[in-house]
Amino acid sequence: MSERMTPIPFKQLMTWIKEEHDNFGTVFGVNAPYVKKNGKTLPLFKEKLETPFGPAAGPNTQLAQNIVAAYYAGARFFELKTVQKMDGDDLAACINRPCIWTKDEGYNCEWSTELYVPQAFDEYVKAWFAIRIISRLYGLGAEDGFMFNASVGYDLAGIKTPKMDKFIEGIRDASNTPIFRECMEVGCELFPELDGYIRATPSRICDGVTVSTLHGCPPNEIEAIASYLITEKHLNTFVKCNPTILGYEFARSRLDSMGYDYIAFDDRHFREDLQYKDAVPMFHRLKELAEKNGLEFGLKLSNTFPVDVKANELPSEEMYMSGRALYPLTIEMANRFANEFKGALRISYSGGADFFNIKQLFEAGIWPITMATTILKPGGYGRMVQLGNLLDGCEFKPFAGVDYEAVARLSEEAPTNFHYIKPIKEAPDRKMGKGKELPLIDCFRAPCKSGCPFGQDVPEYIELCGKGLFLEALQVITAKNPLPFITGTICAHHCMDKCMRNHYECPVNIRGTKLQAAEGAFEELLAITEMSREGEKVAIIGGGPAGLAAAYHAQKHGLQATVFEKRETLGGIVRNVIPGFRIGDDAIDNDIALIKKTGAEFVMGKEAPDVKELKAMGFDYIVLACGAEKKGRLDIEGNVMNVIDFLYAFKNGGELKLGRNVAVVGGGNTAMDAARAAKRAEGVEKVTLVYRRNRRYMPADLEELELAIEDGVEFMELASPVKQANGKLVCNKMKLGDKDASGRRVPVETGETVEVDADTVIAAVGEKVDLDLLGRYGIAADAYKKGNKKYGDVYVVGDASRGPATVADAIADAKWVIEDITGREIVADIPEEAKPDKEEALLRKMKLQMPGKCEADRCINCNTVCESCVSVCPNRANVAIAVPGKEMRQILHVDYMCNECGNCAHFCPYTDGRPYKDKFTLFANEKDFEDSENNGFMVVCTKCPKVKVRLGGAVKEYILDGKTGLGDLEDLMLTVIKEHGYLLG
């Protein structure tokens, strides 16, 4: 595969647009258009805009199809990708691949156009014509309701070179260029009904330009470039500023305060780049110069921010930051300049602009607004439809100045705004897990289901809840999960970690929706649950979540379950240890009532018989769900209490004399429970959680950590306990070293000590499996292996198998055991109503939406339609193809449109999924085919039809006659040839 893109000829481009739109209702994969209906426009220079936003100079404005896709979705201001004297092969050779990283904030290591300058010019002219044609053809808006803005750099000498001068003259008047004439003639040929309209296409492509300079460019050079463009080329001019103008101390402090302390940069660029004291008088001069020449001058805020590569984000030493981490810097730049000029200086904005701030920016008088990172995430260009509809509700009026007081408020609010703050902990891996390779066909999967240890059918029950079918939803849930109240309240919800909505704003509230279903239909489900006492007998030792789940599944699948619980109550750790402020007894009782209704029997209040006795009693299988009850120890001197003992006493009314100051040692969820409980204990004034690493590396779930902070728990990070005495806990002071195998940085002693007030120390350092107890059931200590669940006809599940784990893990183990005993997979019966409307699912993927009453409105139904790789590709190189006989559209990668930016790989739910390398690929010709290792094909003859195919490294030619043995791949290739011929050129 080559990273070089091949521009699409104008005739093919327009044929593609027309056939795709007419046959499938989409344009370059954008599933719905923005249509301008209210007629409102904004004047800019001598032109007008139907919307004040569009794609920033970058990957989304490099090729004609990118620009057209953005227009179709609602963009009307296009900052074209920067052109400079270095171009084509010379520039492409300097760009390491992949070159885009947008998992959260954005990074890139690519800069100006990878095309040759004349090619770039051609792309912009093709897009100019294409937009005018489709605006009229499909009634999307006025033919003059959009504008292009060229971006040029990086020094005056380069801008004055013949090829750059030709480019600039071309955008001023393209009428005599070959591409302009070609587009006009081809357009008239393809759309004769628009002949006069097409021939009236304006030849002035751009009325304005944005100056982009490299870091370290001297002020006099910047001024010389802008002056030249104003006085010699008579172009309205924006000058792009770097965030380094804020100063190192401010940038470091603001980013650190928002959780971006891991972003590495020194003060080099801050010292070498344009300084604020030099910028202000220069911008005054340039503003006056533009006005003198009857033009406008403004600032483009801001350029991307140079930072160091520290975690192998990209294969380079330095990269450029964008997205939500850039917003707090760029809005402060806007604040300073708006205040300096009292709002009189126009600001073109691009620095983390998205759905959550664009309205405020626009209403503050900051426009045009361009963006890159948000449209490189799932939803892609389609996100702009929502932006257009949002801003349609705003007042459109000529620029009368920036509301600098409003901008000051935006900057002041940015450091505490939820949308821009980095969470305390590193984001969990959003991928589905190891061992799941991206297939060539039928790749759509729901990552949430993969994130659930027992494979809960999440999208299905969410869809049912959205339709008010709570009983059906609860039946889907309990087919695999018999503890809907417990898991609907305290589940660690790793499904939500995987939710694709994380790439939009925040995950679907899957756990809350489960509880909604449980509360909405529990009585109905209980009434129709049948009792059974048939089949082989299963003895279950332990009445916690694992034992309860095993009993339920045994009863539902033809077995007889008897649970032996040594306590008088069921529920295990959830009942006896997890504090009541996290889960009430009613929730636990409901789940137990459901399990009892199945006919499971319970023997309470005494130790379970050993293996011999159980066998003598006629039990065929034994399931050990006895937890991990061997207490963990913190090996230090002093007043130290085990966390389970403490939580048990706290929940069950035991006497606690903790003193005024409590230290909890540990960083997991149990430690958070203990700290929050201690805050509520009588006589306790201060609780400090002590951990040897920092918060970012605590194993606790983010939610539990945040709740502890909300409750007023204090934190002593980088501290390892040594001893407790005289009301103090003495700790070794630690520092973080290199990362270990888990990805967490290893704590290293510094040789210093620190103290914290502590009358009592609660040790939350992990419980262990009681091997002596397992020995009573025939599992010798040397035979026990952590994670192993089967020892002959004795099974070990939950914490007894894994060590301390989650309720969901316990349910997963229980489900697996019953599947192993019965030899049948436990699956849910999915009703037809659980299947969403595919078109609605596609439209949901285009919208950002915070949680609300009905989470079904936010679920994007990845089990039905994924297509993330289609939406995030700036070049439209991943195409969704409807193949006859296949329920869902298949993904075809188009080689000649791809530059290996790698963006699609970040959002493919498969762990190592790289659609640009792993999906079946269409090649334009023999050379491209040979230059790649991708599985894929090239068309040798469309009439035969004959193709050349590579699969697993083997190359072979086929006549597609139904006898190739290629199955679904043959159907895909035939569909491309017969129904998508525009892809072939």
Where does each model-flagged region fall?
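Beta1-alpha1 glycine-rich phosphate/pyrophosphate-binding loop at the start
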Residues: 456-466, 474, 503, 507-511, ...
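N-terminal capping/small domains of soluble enzymes
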Residues: 1-227, 232
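Ferredoxin-type iron-sulfur electron-transfer modules and their immediate structural context
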Residues: 318, 324, 375, 382, ...
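Rossmann-like dinucleotide/flavin-binding elements
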Residues: 540-562, 603-612, 629-634, 646-702, ...
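Glycine-rich phosphate-binding active-site loops on the catalytic face of alpha/beta enzymes
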Residues: 76-86, 243, 360-387
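Catalytic cores of alpha/beta
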Residues: 65-69, 353-369
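Glycine/Thr-rich beta-alpha phosphate-binding loop at enzyme active sites
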Residues: 23-38, 247-343, 378-396, 637-638
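A short, basic/flexible loop-to-alpha-helix module at the beginning of a structural domain
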Residues: 39-47, 519-538, 645-659, 849-850
